[in-house]
Amino acid sequence: PNEAVTFAKESNVDAMAVSAGNTHLQTNKIAKIDLEKIKEIQNSISTPLVLHGGSGIPNLIRKKLARETNIAKFNIGTELRMTFGNALRKQVKNNPLIYDRLQLLKPTIPEITKITKKIIKNFGPQ
C-alpha cells in the first residue's frame, strides 16, 4: 500500500494496476487473490484499480471484487484468446480445403461474442 500511495502521488495516474495474486497469461482459474491487500491499497488511494491476469481469477471472485472494491478494469485477454484459438483450430480442422482467411475467421466471431457476453453477465447481479 505504501508504494501505491507514493506511485499514485508522484505519477498522477488515472488508474493503477496492482498485483494481489493475479498473474499475466494465466490459462486456468486458480489465482488466489489477496482481497485484504486490494482493500488496503484502495483505502490508501483514490485512484481506480486495474487487475491484469483477470482470466486466471475464478468467476465468483471476479464478481466479488467487482462489487466490493474499486477495481475498474479486469484484463481478460487470455480468456478471449483461448476461445478464439480453440474456435479457429476447430474451423481449420473441420474445413481443410478452405484457405480464405475471412472464411476461416468468420466462424470464430460467435464464439468470442458468446464468451464475452458470459464474462460480462458474470460480473452483474444474479
Show the residue positions of the predicted features.
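Active-site mouth loops of central-metabolism enzymes
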Residues: 1-2, 51, 104-107
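Alpha/beta enzyme core
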Residues: 1-47, 59-71, 76, 86-90, ...
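C-terminal helical cap(s) of enzyme catalytic domains, especially alpha/beta-barrels
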Residues: 82-125
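Short, ordered loop/turn segments at secondary-structure junctions
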Residues: 20-22, 53-54, 78-81
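Conserved short-loop catalytic and cofactor-binding motifs
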Residues: 25-29, 53, 100-104
